[in-house]
Amino acid sequence: MKREAICFTAEEILNRGKNDIPEELLSGRNLVYSSPATLAYNSPGAEGFGVKRAGLSVPESIMLIVAPGCCGRNTSLISSMPEYKNRFFYLEMSEPDLVTGRHLNKIPDAIKEVLEFLRDNGKKIPKVVMICITCVDALLGTDMDRVCRKAEEALIGGEFDGIKVRPCYMYALTREGRRPPMVHVRQTIYSLLEPMEKDARSVNIIGGFAPLENTELKEYLTLAGIRNIRQISTCGTYEEFLKMASANFNIVIDPEARAAAEDMNKRLNIPYIELTRVYSSGKISSQYKALASVAGIDIDDSAEKAEADEAVARLKNAYPDLKINVGECTNANAFELALSLTRMGFKVGEIYATLAPENYVYVKNLALLSPDTKIYCNMEPTMLYYKISQSDANVTIGKDAKFYCPYIPNVAWNQDTRPFGYQGIRDLMDKIFESMKEAKA
């Protein structure tokens, strides 16, 4: 057996076709190697906005984590953040619980105990209790909707009457399924909204858990007469969050929120339009034209598009032969980003990402422009043999790419606040420029 990391060029994948993507690049087909490069994203409850932080994005909510001790330990770092103080609580499962499932009968009493603790210590009583469970209950076949319903019914008639109880599934083993954890948690969050009279000048931006900042999208909506632009991250109270049900339409900025948007369309009669995060100014312009047409508003994006193109030109002029490696632990689709960078005139040497069939179209177009670009899968066991000195790239994008190329300038590009639209292109180009400038100093 060769001790080298398996990779395929974009041209090789193009020649094989969409229906014959190498199994080494697909998730769930082989043994999984938990590369240290991706530990931050491997667990749905780990770093960044995983299930736990996402669940607590609902204002005035707390979380009861029902799990064996080993599953809850990665919450310690999150719970140390000031904004999460007195919001995480634990119901530890014993070994008999793992076999019998008797821990489920303890949940109503555990919730009451937590609420009494908050009351007795002068803390604010929450409006929502999120129950976070792990793969253990997935294997037990636990009906968490029923468990939460019974827990909520147990509060009726008492001092905590009216508090909502909802499930959060920290099921790492369902990440490749129909409803991965981050899809389900978004559905859970917005299921709390109740029908409300519509406001023609209100819009929701859903998908992210940190507010969109310095993005032209909000400016366009404001200029079009939209008075209320709501994001869950900017709702200070539960009552303010509930007003999201009055929106005239939703703007979905993350595919993982699509199922939640469809639920809201059926249940609350709120239609939605999806704006994909891309790094092609041409595609961004097309999306804004579609938004303007659907929403019946005027959008003039010529100035912002010119600024984004200028940022690209500045980097290109300063580093005309720039070669970039792209990882998947970024605020981007690694394959779309690689294609966009190539179209900008940069070279993409390597991509570290799992190739899902829906991303084949990016690789297909990439192969026509950069056939020799190598594609590795972070989860492939042979990544153990990746030689950190083999790449001749000038800069890398993504936390995982930095692991593989530690001696090359890196732009992590995985901040909580997600870049979007032309602002995303400008900021990324500026970050790469600064990184290269610092490396040359």
For the regions a language model picked out, list residue spans one by one.
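An N-terminal assembly and electron-transfer interface module characteristic of large anaerobic redox
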Residues: 1-441
